């Protein structure tokens, strides 16, 4: 079975083709970063309009890259949520239209499940059950994954998502949007512990996160100090250290509470090298394993959607429902299936 995956939940247009036996055949991503840079964040209306302009040419490009024709595609998977309503509707409409024209099934995919399964695209893959830390611009969640479709949200951010805070602080430090990766690069030049920021909610029971207080503390520090290169780097280092240590403490707590030894990190922020290094050391001391996708599969992409779609289509979970998207959609609402690959 070959599945065409379409991702349009936010500001990346992603299209990929995944083959059950040969793996990933093609993966194309168009980023709207430059389009939204002047606004300091994603503008939903602009995002949707740009998806409309780019998605059909990108599908043609992906088919050509894989040297395939529509008749060689057995199913279509598309991100139906969570995400921006207008952006989601573009991908869903195109996917359902092509499925009808090509006479093949289509399946709606949960964006965060696709991220959770992204490490499965690598040669070394995790096995269920495991704890997943999903960190992106819109989500910060700790999830217990017992099987595909069997998820329990152990904790999540009660305010800002990690990626969102990274981008906001990066802008205040004079970096361009999206600035998460640029902030991390700046932090490498920072002096450790010149500034020390709070690790929010680590002394409270439970696994929820809160980053609004850390954001406010960092903003106040930026505003009340000089903006020379070294000082900005020191602030970036303190901010990143606080984020990473907070995430790690909650991950360790989740592993201890569940007795699991396998941790998966995915989502855009999981590409952060400092976060990966910290968690690798932590899992080594815990005699556990850490899994994460390569950087191009951390950010939004069609490959993870195609893979998730393959699993669900093989389980017979396609539907002929009209175009439907869910801007808000919990992982816990997904149907459970047995892993069949």
From Swiss-Prot:
The gene is tsaD. Keywords: Acyltransferase, Cytoplasm, Iron, Metal-binding, Transferase, tRNA processing. Binds 1 Fe(2+) ion per subunit. GO terms for molecular function: iron ion binding; N(6)-L-threonylcarbamoyladenine synthase activity. Pfam families: TsaD. Its EC number is 2.3.1.234. Its main location: cytoplasm. One of its GO terms (biological process) is tRNA threonylcarbamoyladenosine modification. It is an enzyme of class 2 (transferase). Gene3D superfamilies: 3.30.420.40. HAMAP family: TsaD. This is tRNA N6-adenosine threonylcarbamoyltransferase. The lineage of its organism: Bacteria, Pseudomonadati, Pseudomonadota, Gammaproteobacteria, Enterobacterales. It comes from the Bacteria. It catalyses: L-threonylcarbamoyladenylate + adenosine(37) in tRNA = N(6)-L-threonylcarbamoyladenosine(37) in tRNA + AMP + H(+).
